[in-house]
């Protein structure tokens, strides 16, 4: 297997591979003529991701790899997006439930670019997710920060569908700062984010953090890079 994505870098490479393998196996087992069941592929890929991450995995990457386009994952059904399906997972902390949506983007969003900066630091998702789970167990009041990230993400989805790039960038900055406060950033990520922000609308770590990559939203990709 070869990939142009950085591994263990928060870019969803393992989810893309899981979804592709599930789709290939389903195609092999089927008649090869009918359309593949995207929800079932996403379900199987999510289970595979969870098995590799100590029973904890968001369906965001596997749903995006399966559906393509822009995907919104929420703890509720969002009126501003097209609902696709519900995913549940039994985790060490109890059952989790997510609502998966597709989002239509306005043409104005095409004016912006995403610049990816790699730290070169490998950070297994399972390790970082377990770290945050441990923090929340020791300090339950930190769930307020998780809830705030959820609120900002919902606001970001609204800004995205409205094509408000400035608002999206501002929200990215705020979410990154909250994630850093939860201990999932690292010096290398902070250096990349600081370097990108002067020429971008916003920048944040991507994936579980601890290394991997950061994303910068910019209308000047050459300057940001």
Predicted features along the sequence, with ranges:
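FAD-binding core of FAD-dependent oxidoreductases
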Residues: 8-19, 56-68, 204, 209-211
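A short, flexible beta-alpha/helix-coil linker loop
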Residues: 6-7, 175-178, 211
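C-terminal nucleotide
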Residues: 28-35, 43-56, 62-204, 215-225
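Glycine- and acidic-rich phosphate- and metal-coordinating loops
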Residues: 1-9, 36, 40, 44-47
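Short beta-strands and strand-loop turn motifs
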Residues: 2, 172, 206-209
């Amino acid at each position: 297997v070869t990939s142009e994505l950085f591994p263990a870098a928060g870019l969803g490479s393992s989810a893309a591979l899981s979804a592709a393998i599930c789709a290939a196996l389903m195609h092999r087992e089927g008649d090869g003529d009918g359309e593949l069941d995207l929800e079932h592929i996403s379900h199987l890929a999510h289970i595979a991701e969870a098995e590799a991450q100590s029973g904890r995995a968001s369906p965001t990457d596997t749903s995006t790899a399966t559906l393509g386009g822009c995907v919104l994952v929420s703890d509720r059904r969002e009126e501003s997006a097209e609902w696709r399906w519900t995913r549940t997972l039994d985790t060490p902390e109890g059952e989790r439930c997510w609502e998966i949506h597709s989002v239509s983007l306005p043409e104005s969003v095409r004016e912006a670019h995403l610049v990816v900066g790699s730290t070169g630091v490998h950070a297994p998702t399972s390790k970082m997710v377990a770290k945050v789970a441990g923090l929340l167990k020791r300090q339950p009041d930190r769930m307020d920060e998780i809830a705030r990230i959820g609120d900002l993400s919902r606001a970001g989805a609204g800004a995205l569908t409205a094509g408000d790039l400035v608002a999206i960038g501002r929200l990215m900055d705020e979410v990154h700062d909250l994630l850093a406060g939860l201990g999932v950033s690292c010096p290398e990520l902070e250096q990349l984010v600081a370097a990108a922000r002067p020429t971008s609308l916003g920048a944040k770590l991507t994936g579980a953090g601890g290394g991997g990559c950061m994303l910068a939203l910019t209308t000047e990709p050459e300057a940001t890079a």
